[in-house]
């Protein structure tokens, strides 16, 4: 389906009726996102059995409440696996609720940072207060995005707009994430906060978010580690005057786009990463097989290091698909290295036969393509009609340095 929207500025404050801001002082930061009117909310969370206190708290709040007004998030501390962590999570929510003059059960929360250390509430509280004081600043969206960064190299934000019967609907988002990215969020450290002014029910929003997440955040891999804190929220406040039932396909497509763009920004910012990898597997027997194979490619450390060195070692791609669990016939599949625009494509394997070898034009073309900062790996399994695209990044020396020094 053709995209029926345009990209606009503003991130989470692009939709009508939303304010936001953030503040960070060296290691610790806090962000606030606020709807001026009642909103419905949906959330998806990490499936890690070791999960942070704000994850537990917000899961419960989402189940037991139908009206929401705000999201509060802190960086620098994960608030996970500590005595008193739930007390700290509730205190963070209470601080935001008091400042915004709304009930505590209308606030969702999230944290990111080091696991196993008690939250420095005296510092975090000050950061929340600073974020609240300047929620009308022109650069408030960027401030909120920067405030939740940890090892991120750049803030991640996107917004889109589409028109229905003369009225505009907007969806905006911010995210953080660079390491510990291999989410599996069902019902993604990675945080994503999305706002929209569509009129939609809680059930419809939850369903739409789950579908968007499965095609975006759950297809993103930096290092294969699933965080204890992965969370994505959507707030919808109905201020556009457009009902979801009048634009279901348009809204779902726009939400999926926002989610995918945020996911791609996250993997592009993988700790020390220089290159974005998009791995598309088509011709799979089932959707599950397509996902298994594409995720296996972007998760492979050998493939990641090959991309880092611009080495078109197609055997690593074939091996990753082979051990993924997807059905395949090694005598009949294709492997292609392409630029992101699909204008330049190098066949490495065709119908199970090696095309690229030392000195061949195909191998030389693949080497040149792999020097670019965005590359696409295409595998045709020739087993069926299903496909999936996963997102990953290269892996180099800087990743080891960052993670060997993280808690110090």
Swiss-Prot record:
Subcellular localization, as worded in the UniProt entry: Cytoplasm
Keywords: Acyltransferase, Amino-acid biosynthesis, Arginine biosynthesis, Autocatalytic cleavage, Cytoplasm, Transferase
Active site positions, chain numbering: 189 (nucleophile)
Keyword match Hydrolase: no
GO molecular function: glutamate N-acetyltransferase activity; L-glutamate N-acetyltransferase activity
Annotated positions binding substrate: 150, 176, 189, 271, 403, 408
InterPro entries named in the record: Arg_biosynth_ArgJ, ArgJ-like_dom_sf, ArgJ_beta_C
NCBIfam families cross-referenced by the UniProt entry: ArgJ, PRK05388.1
Pfam families documented for this protein: ArgJ
Self-association and partners: Heterotetramer of two alpha and two beta chains.
Top-level taxon: Archaea
Site (Cleavage) location in chain: 188-189
Catalysed reaction equations from the record: N(2)-acetyl-L-ornithine + L-glutamate = N-acetyl-L-glutamate + L-ornithine
Family, per entry: Belongs to the ArgJ family.
Enzyme Commission number, as recorded: 2.3.1.35
Functional description taken from the UniProt entry: Catalyzes the transfer of the acetyl group from N(2)-acetylornithine to glutamate, forming N-acetylglutamate and L-ornithine.
Protein name: Glutamate N-acetyltransferase
EC class name: transferase
Example GO biological process: L-arginine biosynthetic process
Site (Involved in the stabilization of negative charge on the oxyanion by the formation of the oxyanion hole): residue numbering on this chain: 112-113
């Amino acid at each position: 389906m053709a995209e029926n929207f345009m990209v606009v500025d503003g991130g989470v404050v692009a939709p009508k009726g939303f304010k936001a801001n953030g503040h960070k002082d060296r290691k610790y930061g806090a962000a606030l996102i606020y709807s001026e009117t009642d909103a419905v909310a949906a959330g998806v969370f990490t499936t890690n059995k070791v999960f942070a206190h704000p994850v537990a708290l917000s899961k419960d709040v989402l189940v037991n409440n139908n009206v929401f007004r705000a999201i509060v998030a802190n960086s620098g501390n994960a608030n996970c696996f500590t005595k008193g962590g739930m007390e700290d999570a509730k205190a963070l929510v209470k601080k935001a609720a008091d400042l915004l003059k709304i009930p505590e059960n209308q606030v969702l929360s999230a944290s990111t940072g080091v696991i196993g250390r008690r939250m420095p509430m005296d510092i975090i509280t000050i950061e929340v207060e600073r974020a609240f004081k300047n929620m009308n600043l022109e650069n408030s969206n960027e401030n909120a995005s920067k405030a939740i960064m940890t090892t991120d190299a750049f803030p991640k934000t996107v917004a889109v707009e589409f028109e229905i019967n003369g009225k505009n609907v907007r969806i905006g988002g911010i995210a953080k994430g660079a390491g510990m990215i291999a989410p599996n969020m069902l019902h993604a450290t990675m945080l994503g906060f999305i706002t929209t002014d569509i009129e939609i029910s809680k059930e419809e929003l939850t369903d739409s978010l789950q579908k968007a997440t499965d095609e975006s955040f759950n297809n993103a891999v930096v290092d294969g580690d699933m965080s204890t804190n992965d969370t994505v929220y959507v707030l919808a406040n109905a201020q556009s005057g457009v009902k979801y039932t009048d634009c279901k396909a348009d809204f779902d497509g726009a939400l999926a786009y926002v989610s995918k763009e945020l996911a791609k920004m996250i993997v592009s910012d993988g700790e020390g990463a220089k290159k974005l990898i998009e791995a598309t597997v088509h011709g799979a027997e089932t959707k599950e097989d397509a996902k298994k194979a594409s995720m296996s490619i972007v998760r492979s450390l050998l493939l990641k290091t090959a991309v880092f060195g611009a080495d078109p070692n197609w055997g690593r791609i074939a091996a990753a698909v082979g051990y993924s669990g997807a059905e395949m016939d090694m005598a009949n599949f294709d492997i292609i290295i392409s630029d992101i625009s699909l204008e330049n494509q190098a066949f490495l394997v065709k119908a199970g036969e090696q095309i690229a070898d030392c000195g061949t034009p195909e191998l030389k073309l693949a080497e040149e393509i792999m020097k670019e900062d965005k590359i696409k790996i295409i595998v045709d399994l020739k087993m069926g009609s299903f496909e999936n695209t996963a997102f990953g990044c290269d892996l180099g020396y800087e990743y080891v340095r960052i993670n060997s020094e993280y808690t110090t």
